[in-house]
Amino acid sequence: MANILRTVIENDKGELKKLDKIAKKVDSYADHMAALSDEALQAKTPEFKERYQNGETLDQLLPEAFAVVREASKRVLGLYPYHVQIMGGIVLHHGDIPEMRTGEGKTLTATMPVYLNAISGLGVHVITVNEYLSTRDATEMGEVYSWLGLSVGINLAAKSPFEKREAYNCDITYSTNAEVGFDYLRDNMVVRQEDMVQRPLNYALVDEVDSVLIDEARTPLIVSGPVSSEMNQLYTRADMFVKTLNSDDYIIDVPTKTIGLSDTGIDKAENYFHLNNLYDLENVALTHYIDNALRANYIMLLNIDYVVSEEQEILIVDQFTGRTMEGRRFSDGLHQAIEAKESVPIQEESKTSASITYQNMFRMYHKLAGMTGTGKTEEEEFREIYNMRVIPIPTNRPVQRIDHSDLLYPTLDSKFRAVVADVKERYEQGQPVLVGTVAVETSDLISRKLVAAGVPHEVLNAKNHFKEAQIIMNAGQRGAVTIATNMAGRGTDIKLGEGVRELGGLCVIGTERHESRRIDNQLRGRSGRQGDPGESQFYLSLEDDLMRRFGTDRIKVVLERMNLAEDDTVIKSKMLTRQVESAQRRVEGNNYDTRKQVLQYDDVMREQREIIYANRREVITAERDLGPELKGMIKRTIKRAVDAHSRSDKNTAAEAIVNFARSALLDEEAITVSELRGLKEAEIKELLYERALAVYEQQIAKLKDPEAIIEFQKVLILMVVDNQWTEHIDALDQLRNSVGLRGYAQNNPIVEYQSEGFRMFQDMIGSIEFDVTRTLMKAQIHEQERERASQHATTTAEQNISAQHVPMNNESPEYQGIKRNDKCPCGSGMKFKNCHGLRCLQ
């Protein structure tokens, strides 16, 4: 371990030497740039653009370009980046992460690589965690870019597609991580090219990169639509049932936070719902509702996992920031189960139309960089997942903060009494205090105790984060006491008021350790910015969540040896601090493994999504007749149908192929079984294709306007692709939920998911081509299709395409008892739901 640590330190030192050398080159231009007039300095931007177009690389332009931004910052903002900030900027340009302490000027540091990369004209995205920071940084730093002749855009959720497109077309675009992700998904759902807003993803610089790429890595961005459902009553009934249970009726696994019915619980469920066997196949849906009701009532906690808004809506609380996540909903029916639990209106379930995780969203950028004050603990994950190094940048001034050893108390009550006593004593001295909590519930509890103790204070949590910046800015004033949920207010500096330095600076008090050391370090880092004095102190108890779930046997043995008879006994020990950090490392390792596994699953979806979206984009951007593509689909559909009967009896095969042709390609009288008898497979395929082509030409001939033909082709393909892709996403979700059980059969769930997912994707492609073929060949193409498509392409789709009645005869005995996903007996090779089952299923 010592050797590994020594190697890491030596590598960091070597990297800093290289950075220092480049930064000195930037310094060497300082006097030259200072001597230039404003006009001459501003003229550097078009000069750099021309040199870049003539073959100079951004690396070659870096020293001079950084020096230009540095001088411009001094003239426009009155701020001049330090030498260490130049080093941080170089790291950002190289697509890595400079670890810069709180207050070291990360926002100003970013101006240099952002300007340099904007010279290429390919676009730079500066990503922040909320719209307040995007607007603030774009407004402040945008003055420098605008002065230097670059355009700056702000991408906000409330903006129209036109305004978003304008923002993305700017040289530099400020946006939140969520909005960039949703815009990407929405761009891949539009029907017309002019409705797309983003350019190709070039360079992203992510502020608070650990929050976005680590803490929220598993969070999927989901675009979904409502599904008409009358199942709300089942949510309510399941909720009423689980509320009748005793603690013996269910089993909770605390470390994994999972829950299930015990044997007595199963008996009660069968009696309550009048069932013979709860786990019969026909009760699968009901067990899903019961499982969600159990989780909602006994795992998900009010004011910790979610809050109830004044509008009677369930809002998710971000476990890492303490903020409510507007617009987000728990998936798979859990959100509805919580709504039933809290007796608020139950909203309809939704169907996923598109989804992506932040991991895969940001890996699509040509170059990705990020800034944070606490990235070193997650270095392995940044390197393995995102191919980004974490390089600690020295502080401009030495850190003066004093970090005290943890204090451990036997109970939560004794711990909180000690916290309140400490806060009150410091308040009376005038020293500002920032109290960090992990949950909204804890911040409210401490607030009540401080009110009782007569200590005035501000509370910053998920319930009032809209004014967090103002509260945080005042947290360093003399006598200020601020309670903040976790890292709420991150991104806003706490500046010390007059006379506070003499009192010891800002004191940060942590009311418990977080699962991640990084989050604890972020809380500590709010104090002692830019060489200011400060203190940090963590208070722990044996009843804390981390201690209960992951406290080591060694900690317990040590505590048993100590006399903890008195409730207010306190233990202060470096060994204890080391043991707690050891527990945190184990949790971090578990969380990393989980995120890595999520990525392995999501990579299957990523590969398939990229294929679908690339093909979709080709269709949208096409300005030519898509006939060759459609003819290819017809040919492959015929091939699949004929090949599906290659081993069947010739007469049976001929009948099945004719049934397929009549249902998907031709009029009933256009093909007979006798015509196919005696023909080889290749000849049958050729015959069907020739006749199908004739029908295709007749259909297209109804559209005399070439533009109308292209519009019709596009809408047809996109409509089918989008419907099938939405179904496929749901199917993959179901597969992912079920494939874990295969581990019990000694099969690797991820390998099973990959192979099964690939097979399902192949089936989906076949279904897309079959649906396009059948709709194209059987559609009634109306007169209005000769007109140019209307402004709303989706409306046009409804006008242009109305499938003819396709003879299905589902009442025929041969179709009785066929399941949705079984092969259709007609011989098409398609699933029943996509063929003769389509009508009855609808």
From Swiss-Prot:
Manner of cofactor binding, per the entry note: May bind 1 zinc ion per subunit.
Pfam families: P-loop_SecA (PF21090), SEC-C (PF02810), SecA_DEAD (PF07517), SecA_PP_bind (PF01043), SecA_SW (PF07516)
GO molecular function: ATP binding; metal ion binding; protein-exporting ATPase activity
Cofactor(s) needed for function: Zn(2+)
Source domain of life: Bacteria
Positions of Zn(2+) binding: 824, 826, 835-836
TM ranges: none
Enzyme class: translocase
Reactions this protein catalyses: ATP + H2O + cellular proteinSide 1 = ADP + phosphate + cellular proteinSide 2
PROSITE patterns attached to this UniProt entry: SECA (PS01312), SECA_MOTOR_DEAD (PS51196)
Classification via CDD domains: DEXDc_SecA, SF2_C_secA
Record key words, sorted: ATP-binding, Cell membrane, Cytoplasm, Membrane, Metal-binding, Nucleotide-binding, Protein transport, Translocase, Translocation, Transport, Zinc
Localization in the cell: Cell membrane; Cytoplasm
Binding site for ATP: 85, 103-107, 493
Major subcellular location class: membrane
One CC-aspect GO term: cytosol
EC number: 7.4.2.8
SUPFAM superfamilies: Helical scaffold and wing domains of SecA (SSF81886), P-loop containing nucleoside triphosphate hydrolases (SSF52540), Pre-protein crosslinking domain of SecA (SSF81767)
Membrane topology: Peripheral membrane protein
GO biological process, one term: intracellular protein transmembrane transport
Family membership noted in the UniProt record: Belongs to the SecA family.
Known role: Part of the Sec protein translocase complex. Interacts with the SecYEG preprotein conducting channel. Has a central role in coupling the hydrolysis of ATP to the transfer of proteins into and across the cell membrane, serving as an ATP-driven molecular motor driving the stepwise translocation of polypeptide chains across the membrane.
Quaternary structure annotation from Swiss-Prot or TrEMBL: Monomer and homodimer. Part of the essential Sec protein translocation apparatus which comprises SecA, SecYEG and auxiliary proteins SecDF. Other proteins may also be involved.
The name this protein goes by in its record: Protein translocase subunit SecA 1
Name of the coding gene: secA1
